[in-house]
């Protein structure tokens, strides 16, 4: 029979090297939920690890968020917010996600916004940063925002878009770029 070490692989290797006896427990009934719970005591799981555990379990909506993350190169936390129609992620959303109760409600809108972020990335290398994504999602939600106007301004004035310290600073930077008027030469 094949045996697998679920937790403590590195500890086992270290004990082998120094010749210390190893205590172990053999269980045939371990489930991925048990492993997740076991590991959360020793080391915090990343959102990607939670995602993959739910994908393996076949939890609805998780295979779609996995596709979204891989297709658009957007991090898990930002993808959760986008796919639920938010401009930022909350602890409540993240807990719901970890517990396998994530529901995707805004795939079409999130995909449209992700395509726009991809387009922005051509002109601004930090377009995939968390602060920028949360800022641009807030801007996209503004009814008076015109995408074509913005991308035209960005393509002609990309040097005006710079790394910012916060989401709010990015919103101010985006607004300045959006309202930027070309300098008129007076002769």
Regions found by a protein language model. Name each.
Residues 1-187:
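Accessory terminal alpha-helical modules
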């Amino acid at each position: 029979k094949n045996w697998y070490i679920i937790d403590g692989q590195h500890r086992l290797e270290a004990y082998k090297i120094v010749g210390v006896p190893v205590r172990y427990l053999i269980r045939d009934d371990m489930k991925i939920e048990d492993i997740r719970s076991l590991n959360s005591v020793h080391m915090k799981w990343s959102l990607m690890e939670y995602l993959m555990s739910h994908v393996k379990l076949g939890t609805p909506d998780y295979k779609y968020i996995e596709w979204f993350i891989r297709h658009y190169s957007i991090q898990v936390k930002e993808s959760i917010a986008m796919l639920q129609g938010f401009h930022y992620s909350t602890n409540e959303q993240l807990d719901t996600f970890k517990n396998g109760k994530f529901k995707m409600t805004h795939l079409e809108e999130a995909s449209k916004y992700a395509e726009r972020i991809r387009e922005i990335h051509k002109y601004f290398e930090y377009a995939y940063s968390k602060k920028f994504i949360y800022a641009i999602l807030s801007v996209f939600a503004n009814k008076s925002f015109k995408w074509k106007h913005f991308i035209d301004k960005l393509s002609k004035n990309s040097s005006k878009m710079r790394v910012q310290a916060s989401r709010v600073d990015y919103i101010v930077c985006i607004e300045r770029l959006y309202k930027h008027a070309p300098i008129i030469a007076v002769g």
